[in-house]
Amino acid sequence: MGKRVVLLLAHGTPNTVDEIPEYLRNVVSGRAMPQHVVEEIQHRYSLIGEPKGHSPLTELTMEQGAKLAKRLGEPVYVGMRNWRPYIADVVKQMRADGVTEMAAICLAPQNSRTSVGLYRRAALAEAAGMQVDFTEGWSEEPLLADAFAERLRPAVAALAAETGERVQVLFTAHSVPCRTIQAPAVSDGQPILWPTLKQDAEGAPNVDPYAVEAKRTAAMVAERVPEAAGWCFAFQSQGASGGPWIGPAVEATLEAMAQGGVKAVVLQPVGFLCDHVEILYDIDIAFREFAAGLGIELRRPESLNSSALLTEALAKLARESFLRLDEATARR
């Protein structure tokens, strides 16, 4: 019998501010980034982490892998697309270790050509001779929604007690360029509410599923936290590359909420599984300051990080993947 493992795939992040130029070249497939963009991102990294200038993403992802390995009783490897340990290097090591079957799970729950598709390509490029089962997306996994709700519920209660206001929830996911998902830009600044999801779901079948899946995750979490006064959805952290990115942006949505009289907001990202710069800077610093300027108290729940429910969700996905590998072997 061959050796079977789990491979967790993640975005990756540099360990120091000085490594950011190399990291950004990886993100944009070797293209040069304008110097002012590099310097701005270096500035953001300089404001986060312990010590300052350090993103905890790599350590937290490795911890998630270790917890999953303990829960499963099976080896778990972790590979990053844009930084060390690179996916290609990890898969090469797996081959050297005698691995014959791989259950690959992307730590971006919502399926997209800009995440899952690229991670799949990177993993398969070095996996010759292995049996591979790739989890395409798990945006509607109930345990994932349970994990987010477990973090959200106390944050809503705490902000309500602190402000005396009815608390609205703003769910977010990372924006992506419209060209990558064949989606029109949303630029009117209006919050995306649940009815919009049904309209999106009726789009052309070849449209990237990312935006719809992100909103479905949000809806599942919202159902589990009925004590919130209401919720809406926006896309965060739009990049500097040319062309429009999907929206509406968080800033435009917060403006619309303020105009509607909202005073207290808990912002919960549903596409991120651990702390990194888009949480520790974009949300904790930039969005919080922006909201304060609108008269809104904005808070964020604790990230999933080492959540036991997240570990259970990943374990469930891995077991399902192992079953598919068994079925594929039986058919041969």
Predicted feature residues:
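Active-site-proximal alpha-helix that buttresses catalytic centers in soluble enzyme cores
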Residues: 1-332
